[in-house]
Amino acid sequence: MARWSVWRSPVMLPRSWIEELTASGMRCSSSMPVIRQAYSESSSIVRPFSEIPGLWKNGLANLYNFWKLDGFRNLHRIMLQNFNTFGPIYREKIGYYESVNIINPEDAAILFKAEGHYPKRLKVEAWTSYRDYRNRKYGVLLKNGEEWRSNRVILNKEVISLKMLENFVPLLDDVGQDFVARVHKKIQRSVYSTHCAGSAPFLCLSFTLSFAAVSSVLYGERLGLMLDYIDPEAQHFIDCITLMFKTTSPMLYIPPSLLRQIGAKVWRDHVEAWDGIFNQADRCIQNIYRQLRQETGSPKRYPGILASLLMLDKLSIEDIKASVTELMAGGVDTTSITLLWTLYELARHPTLQEELRAEVVAARAESQGDMQEMLKRIPLVKGALKETLRLHPVAVSLQRYIAEDIIIQNYHIPAGTLVQLGLHAMGRDPKVFFRPEQYQPSRWLRTETHYFRSLGFGFGPRQCLGRRIAETEMQIFLIHMLENFRVEKQRHVEVQSTFELILLPDKPIILTLKPIQASR
């Protein structure tokens, strides 16, 4: 049975934090036992906001202690430890960032019911500061209020509606086929009959796969995925996205305006990263716009999301550019890392891998090779992706500023408060998931309720706009990988997560890909 290092090596709280806990009447030992409740479950008395347990009285001191704990990389572990210490709800303030944190699915339901007509999540100050600095429009990811809603309704029809899948699937299937063809070619060129997946070249390949997939859907043409080399512009774009995420994390707790004033390197690097992202997106958008103006009549094939939005003519060009750029930036690291985690788990569970492969082979035969039909016949593959997002979520938490007063765990929380649902912590909570440390895709096939337990893409009208693209891309990728390769891992190498705005592997995931024919 796999054991998670977060249980082996709990994050130790600084003495000043322990003193604050003691002063508030909570018991805290050096071994940080699982308390799971700091309240009376039988009590029906609603307690005031000021009595929510946690570390919220001194934001600057907490920021210093957070830094000492290397919290910029260990946020997910610290959140998990806080839930173990304070129970299913706690309040914290780190620097100028203040929130209430919850973990139970039932409390998540209360939270999302209180998100209001215009759901508002955590404002990523670093991203909005860059756009203000460069005088760029906000996309739908960063907008709020009526402008967000009107833009989102239009984008939903072209991006996330189920009927659009028939347009996306052929494009994503082509990318998946070319990807495995490239891996086969690399194996044939090597002196071995296997391919080491986890070295820098393979990671570049996986990032490039996601870049090619999202660009195919957005622009109707593929960018960056070549059979013999990786396009330098595509690689630069990927590098910029990685740098953007890495430099965002420190600015969650320190105002970007302050870092800009003092000329901090993290701010300069952040600007450089976003400049590269927008420059690449601008070139792609300009090319498509130019092609549309030169063409006459309706396109003979699906032209991509960008062209569809331009022809629809319901959003300004600047609004379209802003949201398409966000989709581009959000569609590379996130999906490629989830796929890499899935391959890692399948390599750790070879029997399960064979079950998924058998399902894919049967689906191929039953659907006669029709990919859209195949996607309806792979419940275990879909369960594997859900299980990956449970154990290795891209985001540490989901956030909402509540539009009305609510009561959670018998505590009153006033309207306007930022409330976070701990995704990473919930996925490891034995009160929510049976044997949470085990990778069991079949848990998602059972008849018991999954009420507010699968939230890897968010929930409600503010869920991930690129959800359909990401889900379909990952399902098709796994189909092709399972049909072509057996995946194995190095023995005795356990990989954990590190926080860089999104959760990433803390060390290279080293896998071996063996072509199916060669391994028989």
Task: Please give the residue ranges for each predicted region.
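Cytochrome P450 heme-thiolate monooxygenase catalytic core
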Residues: 124-128, 166-339
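Conserved cytochrome P450 K-helix E-x-x-R motif and the immediately C-terminal K′/meander segment
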Residues: 65-87, 279, 283, 370-409, ...
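Cytochrome P450 substrate-recognition site 1
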Residues: 34-70, 74-171, 175, 202, ...
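C-terminal helix/juxtamembrane-tail motif
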Residues: 81, 486, 502-520
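N-terminal mitochondrial targeting presequence
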Residues: 1-49
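Cytochrome P450 heme-binding "Cys pocket" and the immediately downstream C-terminal segment
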Residues: 350-352, 467-504, 508
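Central I-helix of cytochrome P450 enzymes
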Residues: 210, 214, 277-282, 307-361, ...
